[in-house]
């Protein structure tokens, strides 16, 4: 029954890891990251859970004759913020899954 003991130990380790990852995910909810575009003319703030929290657009970014530029800036800033949130998530959760081959992590 030696294999059973190893399995129990592995299950305990997995439960411990799940608990730590759950705690990290809760912390991520409170984290904020920003993406900017146009030299800071547009700033998007998202949570660690990739929820858009704020969009700031400086007055000089608004040109009624070139709405497409503003749209592009908002998209670029949002994408940058989302990428930073992904990196933060990977950094925080990755330390708990090192060495494990878990799809999506």
Swiss-Prot record:
Identify the Pfam families for this entry.
Answer: YbaB_DNA_bd
Entries under SUPFAM superfamilies matching the protein: YbaB-like (SSF82607)
Which terms does the record give in the GO molecular function aspect? DNA binding
- For this UniProt entry, what is the primary localization, expressed as one broad class? cytoplasm
Show the ranges annotated as biased composition (Low complexity).
7-16
Q: Is DNA-binding one of the keywords?
A: yes
Q: List GO terms (cellular component aspect).
A: bacterial nucleoid; cytosol
Query: Any keyword Lipid metabolism?
Result: no
The annotated region (Disordered) lies at 1-41
Q: Which Gene3D superfamilies does the entry mention?
A: Nucleoid-associated protein YbaB-like domain
Keywords in alphabetical order, please.
Cytoplasm, DNA-binding
User: InterPro entries, per this entry?
Assistant: YbaB-like_sf (IPR036894), YbaB/EbfC (IPR004401)
Protein localization? Cytoplasm, Nucleoid
Q: What does this protein do?
A: Binds to DNA and alters its conformation. May be involved in regulation of gene expression, nucleoid organization and DNA protection.
Q: How does it assemble?
A: Homodimer.
Name-wise, this protein is Nucleoid-associated protein SSP2277
């Amino acid at each position: 029954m030696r294999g059973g003991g190893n399995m129990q130990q592995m299950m305990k380790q997995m439960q411990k890891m799940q608990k730590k990852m759950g705690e990290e995910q809760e912390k991520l909810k409170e984290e904020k990251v920003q993406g900017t575009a146009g030299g800071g003319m547009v700033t998007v703030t998202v949570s660690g859970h990739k929820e858009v929290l704020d969009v700031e657009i400086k007055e000089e970014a608004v040109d009624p004759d070139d709405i497409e530029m503003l749209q592009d800036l908002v998209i670029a800033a949002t994408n940058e913020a989302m990428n930073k949130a992904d990196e933060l998530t990977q950094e925080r959760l990755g330390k708990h899954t090192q060495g494990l081959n878990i799809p999506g992590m």
